[in-house]
Amino acid sequence: MNRLSKRKKILNCIDKSVQYNIADGLRILQETARVKFVENVDVAVNLGINPRRSDQNVRNSVVMPHGLGKKIRIAVFTQGESNVVLARRAGADFAGLEDLCQLIKTKGCTGFDVFIASPDVMNIVSQLGPILGPKGLMPNPKMSTVTQNLTDTIRNFKLGQVRYKNDKNGIIHAVIGKINFNISCLQENLEALVFSIYQVKPTQFKGIYIKKIYISTTMGRSILIDKSSLNVLIH
């Protein structure tokens, strides 16, 4: 009862109009977590861009310095025995071409988190667009998932590389780790994400680029973060 009362008291003290120091905000998330599974820590970055303008849309990827706390399952589209062996040695859970395409056609995405492809097989992989596209899993050079460098790409995703792009409202949604992570690790993951977003600021954009940053758990309330509490220079 005391634990529930403490949690309720903390929740009641959250002011949606207040910008919280990042460490304080993360601490509140940890103290109010109540579900029986280990929740993700989610981030919503509100950008000042006009998402209807193609030259202002933002997409990129970043390797989280402390990972994401989950095993990433990777499938690689490539041909030739040497490339298949290379991909598997780098950590791919499945590597191939015709057999992988057939697997997806018959069973869907089959639990894979990331699909990577060699450039020379994209003419075949593109036929899977109706299956992979709606789930955001279609290999794309802009997201570093169509590449000649299979080894480094696979290893980066295994380490916790996050792909992101703004939605129709100009908001970027991403996961920065698990709620049971150390606060400093979550903060450094968030700072890596924000810095990456700032690096791909559209060249023609004028105004406030990163307007607001919210953090939340999978099932919890969102908390507005004070941007100046991050160890990243942003505007």
Curated annotation (Swiss-Prot):
- Keywords noted in UniProt: Repressor, Ribonucleoprotein, Ribosomal protein, RNA-binding, rRNA-binding, Translation regulation, tRNA-binding
Known InterPro entries for this protein? Ribosom_uL1_bac-type (IPR005878), Ribosomal_uL1 (IPR002143), Ribosomal_uL1-like (IPR023674), Ribosomal_uL1/biogenesis (IPR028364), Ribosomal_uL1_3-a/b-sand (IPR016095), Ribosomal_uL1_CS (IPR023673)
Source domain of life is: Bacteria
- What Gene Ontology molecular function terms does this protein carry? rRNA binding; structural constituent of ribosome; tRNA binding
Q: Record's family?
A: Belongs to the universal ribosomal protein uL1 family.
Function summary? Binds directly to 23S rRNA. The L1 stalk is quite mobile in the ribosome, and is involved in E site tRNA release.
* Gene it is expressed from: rplA
Q: What is this protein called?
A: Large ribosomal subunit protein uL1
Q: Which GO terms describe its cellular component?
A: cytosolic large ribosomal subunit
